[in-house]
UniProtKB/Swiss-Prot annotation:
Taxonomic superkingdom: Eukaryota
Species for this entry: Mus musculus (Mouse)
Keyword field contains rRNA-binding: no
Protein name listed in UniProt: Alpha-defensin-related sequence 2
Record-linked SMART domains: Defensin_propep (SM01418)
Biased composition (Basic and acidic residues): 27-40
Function of the protein: Apparent precursor of a secreted, cationic, proline- and cysteine-rich peptide that contains Cys-Pro-Xaa repeats. Unlike cryptdin, the proposed mature peptide region lacks the structural motif characteristic of defensins. It may have microbicidal activities.
Family: Belongs to the alpha-defensin family.
Gene that encodes it: Defa-rs2
InterPro entries given in the database record: Alpha-defensin (IPR016327), Alpha-defensin_N (IPR002366)
Length: 91
């Protein structure tokens, strides 16, 4: 009976030592810096960096260049789309 208890204690001790060594290696790999970890950057863009024509139109809607007359093809248009001096409209 004493041999069985001693054998069981040795088996438990072996499992504990093995578990401690696995835990130590896991902690070491977590604290070590992974190669290229700091260099990884992600940039996501959903459109043109200068903006889109829709954004420009939304920002300038209702404005009219003082130099430009109303558009002859569309009298209800508040801006002149053909004027070369007009900076309100994207070309």
């Amino acid at each position: 009976m004493k041999k069985l208890v001693l054998l069981f204690a040795l088996v438990l001790l072996a499992f504990q030592v093995q578990a401690d060594s696995i835990q130590n290696t896991d902690e070491e790999t977590k604290t070590e810096e992974q190669p290229g970890e700091k260099d990884q950057a992600v940039s996501v863009s959903f459109g043109d960096p200068q903006g889109s024509a829709l954004q420009d139109a939304a920002l300038g809607w209702g404005r009219r260049c003082p130099q430009c007359p109303r558009c002859p093809s569309c009298p209800s248009c508040p801006r002149c789309p053909r004027c070369p001096r007009c900076k309100c409209n994207p070309k």
